[in-house]
Design a protein with these regions (language model features):
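N-terminal amphipathic alpha-helix/helix-capping segment at the start of soluble metabolic enzymes
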Residues: 1-17, 159-172
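Acidic (Asp/Glu)-rich catalytic clusters
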Residues: 5-10, 35-42, 78-88, 109-117, ...
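Short, acidic/polar
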Residues: 25-39, 102-109
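Glycine-rich, proline-tolerant flexible connector loops at the mouths of alpha/beta enzymes
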Residues: 41-74, 128-139
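Alpha-helix-loop-beta-strand connector modules within alpha/beta enzyme cores
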Residues: 60-93, 139-174
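Hydrophobic faces of well-ordered beta-strands that scaffold small-molecule active sites
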Residues: 15-21, 44-48, 91-95, 120-122, ...
Length: 175
């Protein structure tokens, strides 16, 4: 169910949860156990945040420095899959402009569609540590409004669903 439908059909207040994907090294069971106490409140949906990957500069033997990608967290898509495997609750992953090319966003949309996830929070995202201003990823989106248009354009083509012979719907993703 789309979160917009949940909100429109609600006559009383209800909780929702927002979680940050855990650091690498946590098990699936530990993740689900950490969420369990909140499930007693019967949330209608769970938001799963997303953050840019970080980089660090390491000195090479010749004295120069090279940039190395650091991925400290489990992906929001993986966290959504874990939640869906145990709980009957809508998951709402965040997609961000920063750190993603347009093609990487489309790949994430393919994965979300494959999993049956059709709710998304589209954000520009934060600047990288040490940046004074947000710098878009080359080949990516600069603004959340561009990301939303990219998602709408993607869902309009329903590339993934058509390639799998599934029913198409121009309103597949709720943004």
């Amino acid at each position: 169910m789309k979160v917009s439908e949940i909100l429109a059909g609600s006559t009383k207040a209800y909780p929702s949860i927002e979680i940050v994907p855990p650091l690498r090294g946590i098990t699936n069971e530990e993740l689900l156990e950490s969420i369990a106490p909140f499930m007693e409140f019967k949330p209608k949906y769970i938001n799963v945040t997303s953050h840019r990957d970080e980089y660090e500069f390491r000195q090479n033997e010749d004295g120069t420095f090279s940039r190395h990608l650091i991925r400290n967290r489990i992906s929001e898509t993986t966290v959504c899959a874990a939640i869906m495997s145990k709980y009957d609750v809508e998951v709402v992953p965040h997609l961000i402009c920063g750190g993603n090319t347009k093609e990487e966003i489309e790949s994430r949309l393919d994965n979300l569609a494959f999993m049956g996830i059709n709710n998304i929070v589209a954000l520009r995202g934060d600047s990288m540590t040490g940046e004074k201003r947000f710098s878009p990823t080359p080949g990516g989106y600069s603004y959340a409004s561009e990301l939303v248009e990219g998602i709408r354009s993607y869902q309009g083509s329903n590339a993934y669903r058509r390639s799998r012979g599934l029913q198409t719907d121009d309103r597949y993703f709720c943004i």
